Amino acid sequence: MKKTTIASSAVASQKQTQSKLGNTSSKITEQQTTHDPALSRSFRGHEDIITCADFDPKMRQVASCSKDSIVYVWNFKPQQRPFKFVGHKGAVYCVKYSPDGETIASCGQDRQIRLWQNTVQSKCSIIKAHCGAIRSMSFSADGGYLLSSSDDKTLKLWRLQDKKFMCSFAGHKNWVRSGVISPDMRLVASGSDDKTVMLWDLNFQKIVSKYSTLDDNVKISQINSYSDHMDTVSQVLFHPDGTCLISSSFDHKIKITDIRSNKLIQHYNAHDAQVNSISIHPTGYFLASAGSDSKIKIWDLRQGRQIYTLYSNDKDITTVQFNQSGDYFATGGSQNLCMVWKTNFDQNIQNIEQVQRSTVRQNDVEYSSGGLYAQTLFKTNKTASLSPSKKTISIIPPQQLQDTFNNRGDDELNNGRVHENKQSNSPTFSQQQQQQQLNLSENQYPGLEIVGNQFNLQQSTLSNNNNQNNLIKSQNDSIVSNKNAIPFHPSSEFQQSAVQQQFSQQPKLVVNNGTATYPSNFVPKVEEENIMTEAIAASMQQIYSRLDTMFQYMTNLENRVVQSEQLQKSFVSQNHQNTLDPKQQTMNFGYSNIQDHSLSASLNDRNVVNIFQAGALANTGSIEASLINKQQEE
């Protein structure tokens, strides 16, 4: 009896179960927990290592290929027998279904691509594609093109309608293990034994228009090259949204790169041996990986962590592949068995989608989106602006959340990280409430006005637009803060309870079409203004005092400079006198001393003026330091 242990993480209640698999049986003999992956079917027929497996898009079959040079097609209906395609000479490395499920493509050691009709009595079309073994293939999203990767260090694009060669991608310095076409059919990614991942630009519109009238060759260009891996790149994949590139390597690692910013955003030390294959769930939430350490691992890309580990008696697990709906995934390896697993992710995905569609209120604190509390999306810092008269500070009122979502930057990626959003200029409150001001007493905050306040929203992993109005309401429920305001943190029970107590006595806001308004009987309380506002008021008052002192001193300096210049002119006029009596000479001698002192004072005063000008450009602290030093010198 072969034994497979399925170890799940805390997401699956941290339970471990075991299932015993017979050599030819396709049933599970031991009950497993509800949300754990479970073996559904196993197919035996190959005589050598299984190298690749793929699902029929209509979920009628699963195809597998092997080093025994045979392609098997396994039917899920028990009454239908499997059939096999024979024709390759040597190992078959890859098998793929076309998007419509009517064609099966296979390639291998014999340097050929074979296109099979998905019937028992199949006709085969042969494309002599490369000068070396063909390692992998990828269909375009519309099924019209096929990309092949080869040991001849190139990738080639083929038009399936007439089996015609379109273009070649040359740039790698070693075998090309994997190539894939992006979902929007504009990019091609490739991974090679030269430890690099390359990204290529490809415009399919040029293929069918401009270049098809010439020689059907496509002008391509290499966009970028990534060399983060330390060993052979075994496979590359595009994320379903087309913004990220996922690569696996023999260096035991899996890396996810944002192709818009060319930045590495996730990195996993995935296996204890080389990673042979990866597959992305259609939702983009989960990633499956297979390695030579006898393990299959499932990763939650939203949380950035491993959630399942499946142990197998296969020394090398060479392939893993999700089906089109994400309900199943297939694996194969050195035991020559093609295994089909039920993911049981549907319940987890339903829970996620249900939370995204609705919000739950507890003590006037709303939370939503995958268990992330809504209050963790808010920061208690304020955004302030100084009035033209420099006598008031206005705390900008809350902005409309819809524009915040629409104006977010391209560097934001729904991968579990928190990003700052761009500010919106569209107000959420009505015009009457925008004009509402909280007039503070002159003794407490001299010359200061406070208008509203604002919480700056940071976006977490929110993709469903249905919960935006709920977040607007959650944001505006927290519009009035107090002196005991604390920073939000999702992992602190104490802070959560304090937040709930803080907001429990605050007024409800009425939300209508994304616009939040105060109740008619509500009057904001001045004494509950945030302590941060007090700090702003005190700081600005100190700045005003320092500026007044600085201006007075600069005025005195200018007067002294004028007096010194007048004394200097008077002394020069006296020197032009031709005859002087002894008494006048004594007077001139006195003027000379005064002139020397005045020149020195004039130079010093001008230096002080320059110092003040430089200090004013730097900061108020430097100005104050210059004032104190000059007063001490005098």
UniProtKB/Swiss-Prot annotation:
Entry GO terms, CC: ciliary basal body; cytoplasm
Major site of localization recorded for this protein: cytoplasm
GO biological process: cell projection organization; centrosome cycle
Keywords: Cell projection, Cilium, Cilium biogenesis/degradation, Cytoplasm, Cytoskeleton, Repeat, WD repeat
InterPro entries per the UniProt record, alphabetical: G-protein_beta_WD-40_rep, WD40/YVTN_repeat-like_dom_sf, WD40_repeat_CS, WD40_repeat_dom_sf, WD40_rpt
Gene3D superfamilies, sorted: YVTN repeat-like/Quinoprotein amine dehydrogenase
PROSITE patterns per record: WD_REPEATS_1, WD_REPEATS_2, WD_REPEATS_REGION
Region annotation (Disordered) ranges: 1-40, 397-439
Membership in a protein family: Belongs to the POC1 family.
SUPFAM superfamilies on file: WD40 repeat-like (SSF50978)
Positions of WD repeats: 45-84, 87-126, 129-168, 171-210, 228-267, 270-309, 312-351
PANTHER family: TRANSCRIPTION INITIATION FACTOR TFIID, TRANSCRIPTION INITIATION FACTOR TFIID SUBUNIT 5
Organism per entry: Tetrahymena thermophila (strain SB210)
Annotated function: Required for structural maintenance of centrioles, ciliogenesis, and cilia-based motility.
Biased composition (Polar residues): 1-35, 397-407
Disruption phenotype: POC1-deficient mutant cells display a temperature-sensitive lethal phenotype. Mutant cells also exhibit reduced basal body frequency, basal body organization defects, and loss of oral apparatuses.
Localization: Cytoplasm, Cytoskeleton, Cilium basal body
Name of the protein this chain belongs to: POC1 centriolar protein homolog
